[in-house]
């Protein structure tokens, strides 16, 4: 009987301590919005950010640019924001780069594709 009383008392103390800790911890509303962190987003700024970030990322993969377009596009979407999960930051640019970029031809492909419409809802 003493063992059961001891266990009950121990559990009661643990619950009280847990409730006190949880109650005293300030809950913060996380600001996860990339749009708010980066300032007001508009189509032109998002496109410029996206194309610049993809280009910078692909420069790290010299000679293998054609293999890393999708990877770099996803990385840019995380950095620049996206209109939705499907479109990303500039879908038209990604599709153009996939078609045009060849190993060691990044600057020409970037120049050719950066003027392509993104296909975004407000582009």
From Swiss-Prot:
It is found in: Secreted. GO terms for cellular component: extracellular region; host cell postsynaptic membrane. Residues 19-37 form a propeptide. Expressed by the venom duct. One of its GO terms (molecular function) is toxin activity. Keywords: Disulfide bond, Ion channel impairing toxin, Ionotropic glutamate receptor inhibitor, Neurotoxin, Postsynaptic neurotoxin, Secreted, Signal, Toxin. Potently and selectively blocks the desensitization of ionotropic glutamate AMPA receptors (GRIA1, GRIA2, GRIA3 and GRIA4). Binds to a different site than does the drug cyclothiazide. The toxin acts like a straitjacket on the 'gating ring' of the ligand-binding domain (LBD) of the receptor. It does so by restraining the domains via both intra- and interdimer cross-links such that agonist-induced closure of the LBD 'clamshells' is transduced into an irislike expansion of the gating ring. Ikot-ikot is a Filipino word that translates to 'spinning around' or 'turning around', a reference to the swimming phenotype observed in fish injected with the toxin. The cysteine framework is CC-CC-C-C-C-CC-C-C-C-C. This is Con-ikot-ikot. It comes from Conus striatus (Striated cone). The lineage of its organism: Eukaryota, Metazoa, Spiralia, Lophotrochozoa, Mollusca.
